Structure formats: C-alpha cells, structure tokens
C-alpha cells in the first residue's frame, strides 16, 4: 500500500492526534464527574468573567476530602483545554470561569441543559452497548440488544430510573432547541391543533402551546412515557403506538423520531401520519441532517455523525439521514412536497406537505 507523504512535523502531529484519540474517553468521563459534582452549574452561577479557584469551588461544593482542590484542579484543566471553561493564572492557583460552551452544559433560565444527554450516554446501561458493537458488526444484530437481551425501548419501560434519565435528557434538549426554533420557524401560526408524535413528557408541545395558546396540543407517546408526564395547560397526553394509528390534527410534529428507525418503519409512521392529516396539511419533522460528504470536520458534522453512531449502537435500523434520504421518504409515503425550512443547534425543520 502506498504511503501518504508527510513532513516530519506533520507525521509527529499525526502521532499526537492518534494518542489523543486513544485516550478520548477522558473528556466525556471528566464531564460526567463535573456535572455530577455540580461543578459547571456552580461556575455558571458566578457569571461570565468571574473566576473561581479550585479551592473556592471545593468550598462552595462542600467537599470534605482534603485532596479535593487538587483533584478539581486537574478536572478543571481538562475542561479548559476543550474550551468548556476559561482560565487565567492566579496568585496561588489557576482560576476558571464560564464560557459559551459551559452555558449549554449548565442549567439555563428555564432549568434546561445538554448535561442530561451526556449523563444518559455515559450511563452504565448505555455504555455496556459499546462493548458489544464489534460482535454486532461481525455477527449482526444491535449492540444494545446484545448487551441487555431487549431493545432500548423495552429496557426503558422496565427500568424506571433509566426511563426518567432518558426522558430528562430529551426534555432538556427539547427546551433548548425548541426555544430557538420558535424564534425563527413560523409554521405553527394558524394551526388549530397539533399532534406531537413521540413527544415524550410534553416539553416540546408545552413550549409550542405557550407561544400559540389557541392551538390544541396532543402529546402522543408510549403509555409508560406519557405516564411520567406532568399535567400541562392546553396539552392532552395520549398513550398509544404510532405504528398502529396517530391522532388527527392540523399538523403532526415529529422531533428526533425517524433517526430511531429504519426506512421501512419510518414509512409506516409517515403513512399513518398521512392518513391522520386532511388535504393540504403537513408533517413537521425536526432531525439532524447528515452531510453528503463524510469528510467534514466541523462541529456540526461531528455532532451529526456522533448521533448516527449512537443510533448504530442502540437501535436496530436507526440512523441519521441526508437531505436526499428525507425527501425520498416523504415522496414514498405519498406527500406532495418536501421543504427544508430552518435550523437550530444542528436540528433541521422540514415540512412534508400532503
């Protein structure tokens, strides 16, 4: 095999990158500890530009371990290296502060954060899946199912703690993403009713109804999911199976649903949606869109391919899709038109019109 020619400095840099990849479990596990210790929320509460030392943080977190400041300093150093925190030299210790990335990993004014997503993907339940990915590639099947002898949806229905953690992660993402979507997307205007298929505990629908209070909202998900849902004004929680039927409405909203299923399952869901809609009504889809070129290295591309790999490990047939693949699904399900409308935090809004 021909070797790619590189200069000595490029070759050394490649070796350093390879070493970083070899130790890449460090960052998510450090973040997990920082979140569990409430480190990021504590730094965020201090506000932008206000620096705290490891000793300050150990005191604020009421850590009795005498070695805690030194241990925190090492955790903080990792986070500063990845721009999760800012830093500057103090008289005795390095000092650390909030950054825009930290903003999304700590609770915002709505109490929402991306942190629960990180925690659910570093949970022992999901981590166990990755130890079975190699066997899944060799022998077929899905890593999560091999690890637990059941699907992730079946597991969630039987493990209340994991179910709550999973729902919390979806709630946080929905709150942050939908707030941005509602600032730019105008497709909810004029609707009399909307059905959120796979709407979890209703966080997304609650935000839509809060902005458009004349809309009747139906939050539709599996019975064990809506059973964990709070009472919300203007929202009716309905338990059921989207493969059997979907409640009728002026529009049907699906956020992060299709990436959990293969093409044939997505077609079944879309056809049920098509049946539930009147003429000239629409399905509103919110999903990541994979770029056509797999060689991109920007944050949006990496985030999308990370989620695609998660679907590979967790869900039979689950995957992220390109724009062309979404358009093909829409047309095959009988929808007349497909429109990519707007984007918020890498989640695209698409309309499939009947």
UniProtKB/Swiss-Prot annotation:
Keyword ATP-binding: no
Binding residues annotated for S-adenosyl-L-homocysteine, in chain numbering: 174, 198, 221, 255
Temperature dependence: Optimum temperature is 42 degrees Celsius.
PROSITE patterns per UniProt: SAM_OMT_II
pH dependence, entry free text: Optimum pH is 8.0.
Keywords associated with the record: Methyltransferase, S-adenosyl-L-methionine, Transferase
Active site as annotated: 259
Protein residues bound to bergaptol: 121, 259
CDD domains the UniProt entry points to: AdoMet_MTases
Biological processes per GO annotation: methylation
Matching InterPro entries: COMT-like, O_MeTrfase_dom, Plant_O-MeTrfase_dimerisation, SAM-dependent_MTases_sf, WH-like_DNA-bd_sf, WH_DNA-bd_sf
Family stated for the protein in its record: Belongs to the class I-like SAM-binding methyltransferase superfamily. Cation-independent O-methyltransferase family. COMT subfamily.
Name under which the protein is recorded: Bergaptol O-methyltransferase
